[in-house]
A protein has these predicted regions:
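Gly/Pro-biased beta-strand-loop elements
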Residues: 231-338
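Exported/periplasmic cell-wall-interacting domains
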Residues: 161, 300-407
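Short, charged beta-turn/beta-strand-edge "cap" motif at the junction between a beta-strand
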Residues: 124-126, 223-225, 265, 295, ...
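Soluble periplasmic/extracytoplasmic beta-strand elements of cell-envelope proteins
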Residues: 53, 70-72, 119, 166-168, ...
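Extracytoplasmic/periplasmic, Sec-exported soluble proteins
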Residues: 61, 110-113, 157, 161, ...
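Acidic, low-complexity Ser/Thr/Gly/Pro-rich repeat segments typical of extracellular/periplasmic
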Residues: 2-25, 29-246, 273, 404
Length: 407
């Protein structure tokens, strides 16, 4: 996982400024504990390392339906909790309530659904008034001898022109040809859409070039009773669709510290950015916005680094890769965008603590869609892998079509 870092807010004293800029070993991540203690440097009381506790654990799989879903804080209070359940590309809100003391959220109905993906977003204030956030996901148990596909994007969504239809299967698929034949992706106006397998449990679809704005895409899963592996059969028979919105493609030049935002081919704006520092450069290549969070927590320990940073309230965070590359607001290194690359692989835009629509980060967030393309050039790193997030646009058409299991 890779994420953007930063240093800290400025203080008047020269010593604090020196400590702050010495900490510019940026990085990104989401959810975790530990990290660079800038509040201690600035003389503020420390925040609890794990301010928001969510069970089941982030990334949990095959969670049993009797498991308790809880969001808790040891002090302060929960400000907002949003939980959704996704099944067959459809999102359903999970109703629940925060306790009178503000320390716990629990659902109205305790039993979890089978064969579903749950997403939890929580924001809390500690006893010193500092905001922190967590974003977690987990999937529940799929009955034995059955498999399902978790689908991207959501049903009835409006997406950017770089959206790739991605199916993540709950079981490894042995008969990939049979499963591939049972999935139908069509477009209006018509365009040739082809599949590509990444390993035994992921199947993606895309056209040769980015979708044209206004295209309506339909996905039909005819998986029920299809044998995906010996004795394991599909569970779904479902149709869903989405619409392609306007075209927005942004070009990040890591050497120039700029991002050109183009809407329908016309230059909308050139925005100053900070990319990965020399020791932790940003991936080159085409990446697609996978998720958008108004605020999230980023922590170095969740991306394989040490305790360099733990930023509880990163604003305007847009996920670009499965490994954790984000494009997000940066309030802790306000002089970096446009001048120097200081992150651990993310792309940072100038922002303020708490986020604001009047900043470059807020402006870009408000004008973006899941499915928009962000391309990075002139970074001293390799091209992002095509299975890292929705990175399939980094394969040419011949390479893409060679990934089909059907002759």
């Amino acid at each position: 996982m890779r994420h953007a870092l930063g240093s800290a807010r400025r203080a008047g004293a020269a010593l604090v400024a020196a400590l702050t800029w010495a900490a510019l070993l940026a990085g990104c991540s989401s959810v975790g504990s530990g990290g660079l203690d800038l509040d201690r440097i600035l003389g503020k009381p420390p925040a609890p390392e794990d301010a928001i506790r969510i069970t089941p654990d982030d990334g949990g799989r095959d969670v049993r339906p009797g498991t308790r879903l809880r969001v808790q804080v040891p002090g302060g209070h929960l400000e907002k909790v949003r939980v959704t359940r996704s099944q067959d590309a459809q999102d359903y809100p999970v109703p629940g309530r925060i306790s009178a003391d503000g320390l716990t959220w629990k659902p109205d109905h305790e039993r979890l659904a089978l064969a579903a993906r749950y997403t939890v977003d929580a924001v809390a204030l500690d006893s010193h008034g500092r905001r922190s956030a967590r974003h977690t996901t987990f999937t529940t148990l799929v009955p034995d001898e059955r498999f399902i596909a978790y689908v991207t994007p959501e049903n009835r969504s409006v997406v950017g022109t770089g959206m790739i239809v991605s199916l993540s299967f709950s079981r490894e698929i042995a008969d990939r040809a049979a499963v591939e034949r049972a999935v139908h992706v069509t477009a209006r106006p018509p365009v040739d859409v082809r599949p590509h397998w990444f390993g035994a449990s992921r199947l993606d679809f895309r056209p040769q070039r980015y979708w044209k704005p206004g295209t309506e895409v339909s996905v039909e899963l005819r998986l029920r009773d299809v044998q995906g592996a010996p004795g394991v059969y599909g569970l779904q028979y479902k149709r869903f669709g989405f619409t392609v919105g306007r075209s927005q493609v942004s070009l990040v030049d890591a050497a120039k510290h700029t991002m050109e935002v183009r809407r329908d081919g016309e230059l909308l704006a050139t925005v100053p950015v900070t990319a990965g520092a020399p020791k932790h450069p940003t991936y080159n290549g085409k990446m697609v916005v996978m998720d958008m969070l108004e605020v999230t927590r980023m922590n170095s320990r969740t991306v394989g680094f040490g305790g360099e940073y733990d930023i509880p309230d990163v604003p305007h965070a847009m996920k670009l890769t499965g490994s954790g590359t984000y494009l997000h607001g940066n309030y802790w290194a306000p002089d970096a965008p446009g001048r120097v690359n200081v992150s651990h692989g993310c792309v940072g835009l100038r922002d303020v603590k708490g986020g604001s629509s009047g900043t470059p980060a807020g402006w870009f967030f408000d004008r973006s869609l899941i499915g928009d393309v962000v391309e990075v050039v002139n970074s001293k790193d390799k091209t992002v892998a095509p299975d890292n997030g929705l990175g399939g646009w980094n394969l040419n058409w011949q390479e893409w079509t060679a990934g089909s299991a059907v002759d």
